Amino acid sequence: MPSLKDVKVKIAGVKKTKQITKAMNMVASAKLRGAQQRIERFRPYAEKFYGMLGDLASKADGSAHPLLEVRDEIKTCGIVLATSDRGLCGSFNANLISTALKLAKQKAAEGKTVKFYCVGKKGRDTIRKADFEVVTAIADQMGSFDFQLANKLGLEVINHYLTGELDEVVLVYGEFVSTAKQLPITLPILPIASEKKDEAEAAPSKEYIYEPAVEGLLAELLPRFIKVQIYRGLLDTSASEHAARMAAMDNATRSCDDMIGALTLLFNKTRQASITRDLMDIVGGAEALKG
């Protein structure tokens, strides 16, 4: 049985850990509220943008712009992977990386070359260890970013697609559903023609008057569409990270409470055993004196 001092030290250590996990839970909760507000502010713009672009895409054929063209042969696949820079958020990063690696291995099995564009340290480090090529690695920005990050990454992906370095591009990110649910999402973003036309045909008919011509607008809006998709994925991933960390720290705090309870019980049992031994020594000594 451990000594009373050892048990006291363990209890003190667990209490300090509980203070840290509780503080991290509160910080994650505050950051989650901010991330949710950013998503709510951006969502109406994104939805209107998607609707208008879908209508535009339905009025043009694949030759209207290179980003609408579906290539006959897909040789190289680019995967844009968004993860967090920090850990302590449960299985959040592991699920995203697992989804990305599963996709990469599937593409590789089809004879395609796979190239990664990673945002976040966790994804970058794991993908490099998995021996896949990391073309771009952006770190230490998931905690605080704006549209410029998506703009920079989007421009690079678009340039590589237009020059033939990539034949298709897929975005892997964490969709924020609720504080208790975050899902790894695989979203093809290039080429965009087929999916946007399908959406436009399924949507209620709307009459738009476009000036200048459709082709001119597509040249301006299609690159921005890619950037908007990436930015929305980054916003969702950021909110999902904070929600996952909040849940992980809440579970850790509860585990600390359970451990403190178990250690306190052990402390009381140890102290009781010590008192019993002392009483037995006293009684034994008294009996010896009587004898």
From Swiss-Prot:
Pfam families in the record: ATP-synt
Gene Ontology MF terms in the entry: ATP binding; proton-transporting ATP synthase activity, rotational mechanism
Keywords: ATP synthesis, Cell inner membrane, Cell membrane, CF(1), Hydrogen ion transport, Ion transport, Membrane, Transport
Domain of life: Bacteria
InterPro entries cross-referenced by the UniProt entry: ATP_synth_F1_ATPase_gsu, ATP_synth_F1_gsu
Membrane topology value: Peripheral membrane protein
One GO term describing the cellular component: proton-transporting ATP synthase complex
Main location: membrane
GO biological process terms, semicolon-separated: proton motive force-driven plasma membrane ATP synthesis
Keyword Transport: yes
Keyword Cell membrane in record: yes
Protein location: Cell inner membrane
Record-stated family: Belongs to the ATPase gamma chain family.
PANTHER family named among the record's database cross-references: ATP SYNTHASE GAMMA CHAIN, ATP SYNTHASE SUBUNIT GAMMA, MITOCHONDRIAL
Oligomer status and interactors: F-type ATPases have 2 components, CF(1) - the catalytic core - and CF(0) - the membrane proton channel. CF(1) has five subunits: alpha(3), beta(3), gamma(1), delta(1), epsilon(1). CF(0) has three main subunits: a, b and c.
Task performed by this protein: Produces ATP from ADP in the presence of a proton gradient across the membrane. The gamma chain is believed to be important in regulating ATPase activity and the flow of protons through the CF(0) complex.
NCBIfam families recorded: ATPsyn_F1gamma, PRK13424.1
Protein name, as recorded: ATP synthase gamma chain
Originating species: Nitratidesulfovibrio vulgaris (strain ATCC 29579 / DSM 644 / CCUG 34227 / NCIMB 8303 / VKM B-1760 / Hildenborough) (Desulfovibrio vulgaris)
Record gene name: atpG
